[in-house]
Amino acid sequence: MAVIQVTAERTVNAPAEAVYGYIRDMHTHPKFLPPAFSDFHIESGGVGTGSVTRFKVTAGGRTREYHMTVDEPEPGRVLRESDQNSSLITKFIVDPAGSGSSLVQISTTWQGAGGIGGFFERTFAPRAMRAIYEDELQRLDAYAREQQTA
């Protein structure tokens, strides 16, 4: 089994502190999730470390359910979601990028399957997930811009 990693990043036109706040607030986060995400529920907490969420992601014709626990290894910069039922871990990294903007990276890793199924997973899953994350980052940028003018 090989580790599979998917990463996408984008400059978001809002200060890093504000963007990190949108990401860590599980009540706000669904406002910029793309349609591939569904059935988003907050089971406990709701803001940052200790929050537990449940949602589904449809990619490549498959729908998977995730049960995520949130922690903040670097509060204000890195938020991590760990699936309680698999090896999947997603990190959101937010860094200042100058002129009131920020660079946001979404990175997910998991242990891929072995055999022929693992070959297809390693080949197709990263492409599908990267497209979903690029859409999420675009939506995050639009949401952040909207909040800056509100």
What are these regions (language model features)?
Residues 1-44, 139-142, 150:
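Hydrophobic ligand-binding cavity/cleft-lining segments
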Residues 7-11, 65-67, 89-91, 107:
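Well-ordered beta-strand positions in beta-sheet-rich domains
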Residues 40-89, 103, 135-150:
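Glycine-rich portal/gate segments that line the openings of hydrophobic small-molecule binding cavities
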Residues 12-14, 59-61, 74, 110-114:
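Beta-strand elements of well-folded, non-transmembrane domains
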Residues 82-135, 140:
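Beta-strand/loop substructures that line and gate deep hydrophobic ligand-binding cavities in soluble
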